[in-house]
Amino acid sequence: MKANELREKSVEELNAELLNLLREQFNLRMQAASGQLQQTHLLKQVRRNVARVKTLLTQKAGA
């Protein structure tokens, strides 16, 4: 997910995206804990996407 794509979204859309990412992160962590996760790079990608969305939400709140 690109930062430019996220900047075009509204606050409501960013909150929805954040919720989806957190759910995905939870599912990936459960798969990793049970040894079922084959693509471990997804954990890092989702974590960074969560950070991107949170950063944009903070920036939009301050503007």
UniProtKB/Swiss-Prot annotation:
Does the keyword section mention Ribonucleoprotein?
yes
Q: Which Pfam families match?
A: Ribosomal_L29 (PF00831)
Listed under GO cellular component are: cytosolic large ribosomal subunit
Q: Mention one GO biological process in which this protein takes part, according to its record.
A: translation
Q: Kindly state which keywords UniProt assigns to this record, in alphabetical order.
A: Ribonucleoprotein, Ribosomal protein
**CDD domains recorded:** Ribosomal_L29_HIP (cd00427)
In alphabetical order, the GO MF annotations are: structural constituent of ribosome
- Does the record carry Ribonucleoprotein as a key word? yes
Q: Which family does it belong to?
A: Belongs to the universal ribosomal protein uL29 family.
Query: What is this protein identified as?
Result: Large ribosomal subunit protein uL29
Native species of this protein?
Enterobacter sp. (strain 638)
Q: Identify the coding gene.
A: rpmC
